[in-house]
Design a protein with these regions (language model features):
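Signal peptide processing junction and immediate N-terminal pro/mature segment
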Residues: 19-33
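Low-complexity, Ser/Thr/Pro/Gly-enriched N-terminal "stalk/linker" regions
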Residues: 32-111
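Extracytoplasmic/secreted proteins, especially bacterial periplasmic and envelope-associated proteins
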Residues: 44, 48, 52, 87, ...
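Extended polysaccharide-engagement surfaces of secreted carbohydrate-active enzymes
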Residues: 278, 282-285, 292-597
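N-terminal secretory signal peptides that target proteins for export/translocation
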Residues: 1-4
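Beta-strand-rich recognition/accessory modules
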Residues: 576-645
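Bacterial N-terminal signal peptides
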Residues: 7-23
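Aromatic-lined, polymer-binding surfaces characteristic
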Residues: 76-301
């Protein structure tokens, strides 16, 4: 049997021979779980995480020899990416608060934070850079006359800090819009301006005005915020946006705004709990996930510890998810380099997450870990939770959650049934047809899409005779979940053009009807494409990207069975079509289509057909069956293939 895994392991090892051979942390296995029955004490949780953060933030600060001028490199990676110094400020602030230390690596914390803020002020830092500065300043008191950070600044430096804390750097007060940014940045602006008001830097009218603008979608009754109004982009940012606006309203005592946001928080927290994986991973679709999906879990649990009314589960169970996420991030942390391995072999990132942001993402992880642990440890001790499960006891789930109703509804089908678990979203992405946002079973063991790539991942691309490629995505025309939640029916009469702007559906004379069903441990997808008038499909193609390293193909007569074997899952895939489908397999190496959010996508199975002529009453149908519980049958013959047969 040919092993793709072995070839990839060799390829991954070659660049590692160049630097000094220092042992790194064990790499996490996607979807790995702690043994059932294991428990963790609260004391261990607090001691382990606090000790790590204390040592690592000191190591990071020691790696910054001077702040004037700021170094171009820290720990061997660039510092010119977005939010660099603001994230570092937040990490130092939260770790100092967690440990109770006033000095780190021999440096006075308030004075160091004051210098870091001046770097961001002079670089024109915006959004999360400003948020980090506001949180750092407020940590030392809202009375600036007694605030040691503020007192460490000269009068001209205080003017620079005031400019840094002005949300007008990215919020247009006249138009009441964030400037060229997604909707969730209203939450960032609201947190900054309300902290500014707490510290006497802006008047109450401005704080209330911006807060009301940030709360607009919630005021209109939205449970899930559209991050790109009005296109219908729903992803991880819905929960972050809701948390941010709720916290901002709390800063200025706006209970009315908090109550407007409360229904959203109840909904998004339940959805997060229904989709979180056993290893603590959050939203499996959309942008800015990967390691951030685990940081989200820590952030969310910290929020829920402080706000018990929104908890979807007991605190001890939430702590189990927190611990699982922490363990994954520890496995991803390169202690020899003091960095998260976000650009390791087979790791994909959205285009804005450049190598210039590796250090920033690492310090952001430290900040989120320290900030969330402060809330979690307080709640665990107050509620006398001495220990909790190392693996979160996640409930069985089979339901559809609506994001938006109307002519083009959106939502997500959530399934957690034994080994079969996934989230299948109906939403738009930054570009039509991008794999991260397709209505595919994201999080399904053994299945993973490459990051920010155009790949027909279990959702076909159809190339028409005029050269356009279309896909059934960007919400749907009809979404009908079954009564028991174990099936779903969706219809697309309007399609989107792959690579084009989102939410611009086109009528090409075709209708796609898709039925998903759970059959034991098998997920079944059946699609029927019908024509209202003759339509030539120059090429039909659909892909199955997998985390498996080994492919074994078995034939039973004319029926092909593909077995996908990897660390995460052993799956069997059967694909059939009413017209013959060519099958090929591609080993991706370290190409763009081989980079997943959490690790490599070593292999892609491609199914295709050319020159299909669809006419009324003669539909094209294809079916895929994905069994996550496959075990080899005794005496069965097998062959391995990487090409067409």
């Amino acid at each position: 049997m040919i092993s793709i895994k072995a070839a990839l392991s060799l390829a991954a090892a070659i660049p590692a021979l160049v630097p000094a051979l220092v042992p790194a942390s064990p790499r996490p296995v996607q979807g790995a779980e702690a043994p059932a029955g294991d428990t963790v004490t609260t004391e261990r949780l607090v001691t382990e995480i606090t000790g790590f953060l204390d040592a690592e933030v000191a190591a990071h600060l020691s790696a910054v020899p001077t702040l004037n001028p700021p170094p171009a490199l820290v720990l061997g990676v660039p510092t010119k990416g977005d939010f660099t110094w603001g994230s570092f400020m937040r990490a130092i602030t939260d770790v100092a608060a967690l440990t109770g230390k006033r000095a780190i690596a021999g440096r006075d914390v308030p004075e160091t934070l004051g210098r870091l803020g001046l770097i961001e002020a002079r670089l024109g830092g915006k959004t999360f850079s400003q948020l980090g500065a506001a949180l750092a300043l407020r940590e030392f008191g809202t009375d600036l006359e007694a605030n040691p950070l503020w007192r460490s600044l000269t009068r001209p430096e205080r003017r620079e800090w005031r400019e840094l804390l002005d949300p007008g750097r990215f919020y247009d007060r006249e138009r009441k819009q964030v400037i060229d940014l997604p909707e969730n940045y209203f939450g960032v602006a609201a947190r900054i301006v309300t902290m500014d008001h707490q510290m006497g830097l802006v008047d109450r009218d401005f704080a209330d005005e911006l807060l009301e603008r940030a709360a607009a979608q919630f005021r209109r009754g939205a449970l899930y915020t559209d991050d790109s109004l009005p296109t219908g982009r729903f992803d991880r940012y819905s929960q972050e946006y809701a948390r941010f606006v709720y916290e901002a309203a709390g800063n200025v005592g706006r209970r009315d705004v908090q109550e407007a946001v409360a229904p959203s928080l109840t909904a998004v927290m339940r959805t997060w709990w229904d989709l979180v994986s056993p290893d603590g991973y959050g939203y499996p679709w959309g942008r800015t996930i990967g390691a951030i999906g685990y940081m989200d879990t820590m952030d969310i649990v910290g929020f829920l510890a402080a706000h018990p009314r929104f908890r979807p589960a007991p605190l001890s169970d939430l702590a189990g998810a927190y611990w699982a996420a922490w363990q994954w991030l520890q496995g991803d942390y390169r202690r020899d380099r003091h960095l998260l391995d976000m650009f390791g072999f087979g790791r994909g990132n959205y285009h804005y997450m450049t190598p210039e942001r590796q250090w920033q993402q690492t310090t952001s992880f430290m900040a989120k870990a320290a900030g969330s642990l402060r809330h979690l440890q307080a709640a665990l001790r107050q509620e006398q939770v001495a220990s909790f499960p190392a693996r979160p006891p996640l409930p069985a789930v089979a339901r559809f959650e609506s994001f938006r109703k109307g002519d083009r509804p959106a939502g997500v089908w959530l399934v957690r049934q034994g080994a079969l678990r996934f989230a299948l979203p109906f939403t738009t992405g930054p570009k039509a047809g991008i794999a991260d946002y397709l209505p595919a079973p994201h999080g399904l063991p053994g299945f993973a899409v490459p990051v920010e790539q155009f790949l027909p991942a279990l959702v076909p691309y159809l190339e028409l005779d005029d050269g356009r490629r279309i896909v059934a995505g960007d919400g749907a025309d009809v979404i009908e979940p079954s009564a028991d939640g174990r099936g779903l029916h969706a219809v697309w009469r309007l399609w989107t053009v792959v690579g084009g702007p989102p939410a611009r559906p086109v009528d090409v004379g075709l209708t796609s009807t898709v039925d998903w069903a759970i059959d034991g441990g098998t997920l079944v997808r059946k699609e029927t494409i019908e024509a209202a008038r003759p339509v030539v499909v120059r090429r039909f193609e659909v892909a199955l990207p997998t985390t498996a390293g080994d492919l074994v193909t078995h034939w039973d007569g004319s029926q092909r069975f593909d077995r996908l074997v990897g660390d995460e899952a052993r799956s069997e895939v059967v694909v059939e079509g009413s017209s013959p489908l060519d099958v090929s397999a591609k080993a991706t190496g370290d190409s763009a289509v081989g980079r997943g959010a959490r690790g490599p996508v070593p292999l892609i199975l491609m199914y295709s057909a050319e020159n299909l002529t669809l006419v009324p009453r003669e539909p094209f149908t294809w079916i895929v069956r994905y069994d996550v519980r496959w075990q080899a049958r005794a005496g069965e013959a097998a062959s391995t293939t990487f090409g067409n047969r």
